[in-house]
UniProtKB/Swiss-Prot annotation:
Complex and partners: Homotetramer.
Active site: H117
One GO-annotated biological process of the protein: UTP biosynthetic process
PROSITE patterns to which the protein is assigned, alphabetical: NDPK, NDPK_LIKE
Protein task: Major role in the synthesis of nucleoside triphosphates other than ATP. The ATP gamma phosphate is transferred to the NDP beta phosphate via a ping-pong mechanism, using a phosphorylated active-site intermediate.
E.C. code: 2.7.4.6
Protein known as: Nucleoside diphosphate kinase
Organism this protein belongs to: Pseudoalteromonas atlantica (strain T6c / ATCC BAA-1087)
Entry-linked CDD domains: NDPk_I (cd04413)
Amino acid sequence: MALERTFSIIKPDAVAKNVIGAIYNRFESAGLRIVASKMLHLSKEQAEGFYAEHSERPFFGALVEFMTSGPVMVQVLEGENAVLKNREIMGATNPAEALAGTLRADYAASIDENACHGSDAPESAAREIAYFFSDEEICPRTR
């Protein structure tokens, strides 16, 4: 088993539903440790930069608008196989296809407002973590 870090966003729809604590509980109950966290209201530029890989997709404008519509929580999670574990906790991108008990099944209303984001690979996790956090902001949890 590999100790990994992954990146997670609790999106504006889930923040508005006041389920941040419930989501953090899911992370911790699954063995993931929160090693960095902050609430932000993304600027248009931040959202466009973060989702740049989707800039040519038809949903890009709506995605940026949604991600800037209210505050988000960004966090770094650490644990054994953290990337895969977080993706399992989140569930399918489309909440209609997400398994019961996953974050998206429980808290998302649609594929467009789907409650959370999680890195899809260790490489994207490293890039996404660096986008929002400096090394000094990450607090390894040794106890």
